[in-house]
Amino acid sequence: MIFAPTPPTPPDVPALGDTVTLAVNGVNGAPSSSIVVLLAITLLSVAPALLLMTTSFTKIFVVLSFTRNALGLQGVPPNQVLAGLALFLSLFIMAPVIGDVNELGVQPYLAGDATFTEAVDVGKGPLQAFMLEHTREEDLALLTRAAGLENPEDPSAVPFGTLVPAFLLSELRSAFIMGFVIFVPFLVIDLVVSASLMSMGMMMLPPVMIALPFKLLLFVLVDGWGLVVTALVGSYTGAG
């Protein structure tokens, strides 16, 4: 007996009017573990950019770099040390904001009480309020005009994409002002040492080498690192 082969069955193709639904939630409406892992990896990949653009890290790192240059030290402390100090100072300053973001956005999403879009919209509120508090109105107006938008009556209505560069401009301006204040006393030491060497006829001796110990001594005597860190933290908390 010969049996004819059964013809293959084509897969079901959704009709033109049918809708395809993709579910990303797990049990009881909570996000599945794979989605949580994917979001965690995504956040880790964009964390450096978020750290640089939306927190106090940029200002702190620039001021610490100005301090090192004012002392005349080229590679001490190294950039890794300055970046580490700036990172933990940023975490210290941003701790209340991070706590609010976690409470308002992250935890409701993990509990399944909010969608991802709702969690992002609510969670970015504390971060947006922090940036608005430390952004000059002039920088907001500048970026708003550059984007071709009308100046909003309420600063909180500024789009997030416009607020971030305005915040960075304000942070850089504040960092440069602090850098100028840090440079002045060390510049005076350089001038005094140079004038003293010229008056003694020691023009071949590099003034930078002679001035460096006096700069370090002055910086240690006045507790320079403590003053710089206190000024940086106080510029955000209003203390000091």
Predicted regions and their residues:
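Hydrophobic alpha-helical segments and their helix-loop boundaries in membrane
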Residues: I2-G240
